[in-house]
Amino acid sequence: MMPRHLLPHSGITSLRRVPRRRLPSRRREDFRRCLFLSFVSTDKDGDPTGQASPAVPVPHFTTWGSLIPIDSQRNKERTRFTWMDGPPHGGLGTRFSGRGSASLTAPPGRCFTRERHPVPRQRKCRRQHSTGRKPHCGTRSAAPRNPKSIHKRSFSAKSLKNKTRNESPPVSALVSRTKTQPGQLHFCCQPSSSQAPASRRAKGR
């Protein structure tokens, strides 16, 4: 790679100082707090067997949580640590569980790294029980409260392109049925710029 001062450049950029990428140096220490963790494999009574892994510095901030041993019925014979990545006020965040190591990979039988909660919390409004009567907000089957709705796309892009700007867009059937003048459409379509001052004058009179 050519050194920076020999690289071709336009004259203007030469005035601006290009910040150098700072490489991590061993001289500059990392003052973030660390947990030094070593994982010990245990038998099912909880007595340590075999070799402890070398202590790994895991940067530990107050916002993170910490590593918490889980003893679940499924695997008594291995230590599992849960790495809690939670909000700062100590609520339950996403819990990742690695098995016997600080890696956040899921055990082979499961596709997500989430530790299962005994009572799954219900998700609001996403999909209701199939027999339930109210479907969630956005679906087609949820009938609108008022029988005839004003259609949002009352004019297409093509119709807009053909017309001049100061003609009002075609008024939907509902609006035209309640006899409103094109100048005073209260809802749905804004009156066009040419008609607005006129209608205002009429209203003043």
Swiss-Prot record:
Classification from the root reads:
Eukaryota, Metazoa, Chordata, Craniata, Vertebrata
Please name the gene that encodes this protein.
Answer: LINC00242
Q: Where is this region: Disordered?
A: 95-205
Protein's recorded name: Putative uncharacterized protein encoded by LINC00242
Organism field = Homo sapiens (Human)
Bias-annotated ranges (Basic residues) = 119-137, 148-163
Comp. bias regions, Low complexity? 188-199
